[in-house]
Amino acid sequence: MKYDTSELCDIYQEDVNVVEPLFSNFGGRSSFGGQIITVKCFEDNGLLYDLLEQNGRGRVLLVDGGGSIRRALVDAELARLATQNEWEGLVIYGAVRQVDDLEELDIGIQAIAAIPVGAAGEGIGESDVRVNFGGVTFFSGDHLYADNTGIILSEDPLDIE
């Protein structure tokens, strides 16, 4: 499904929170949306592998990487895993790498920046926790919609036809 965050903001202005414009699109899908699963991890993506092995249909993995752009939390291998398991998208408050490969995958990926250095894989982090960045507080179960214009969040799914 294609989402237009500008149109959604016009319709649901009182019901959505708008994330500050910190993110760029790195995935092959320009718009995406779904129910979020939150993760908090810093320069370590081991936990992301565990989560992305699950069925992601209708879901978006939202990762608070502390805004670090020193190590990429998502690379082509991890994004392929997410695509294979039907995740709608990834929002990374941190960095990604192998961007040419990411652009070829049918998944939405929004992140702050790209850097060639990969993350540790020790599995240090937490999932299903409250995270805050970009002026918005996120909870697992909230609904996120993203496109090249921005990212918005709603507690409940928006009625989109």
UniProtKB/Swiss-Prot annotation:
Subcellular location(s) per record: Cytoplasm
Predominant subcellular localization, coarse grouping: cytoplasm
Any GO MF annotation of the entry: enzyme binding
InterPro entries in the record: RraA (IPR010203), RraA/RraA-like (IPR005493), RraA/RraA-like_sf (IPR036704), RraA_gpbac (IPR014339)
Family that this chain belongs to: Belongs to the RraA family.
Cited PANTHER family: 4-HYDROXY-4-METHYL-2-OXOGLUTARATE ALDOLASE 3-RELATED, REGULATOR OF RIBONUCLEASE ACTIVITY A
Protein name as it appears in the record: Regulator of ribonuclease activity A
Species whose genome carries this gene: Salmonella choleraesuis (strain SC-B67)
Gene designation per UniProt: rraA
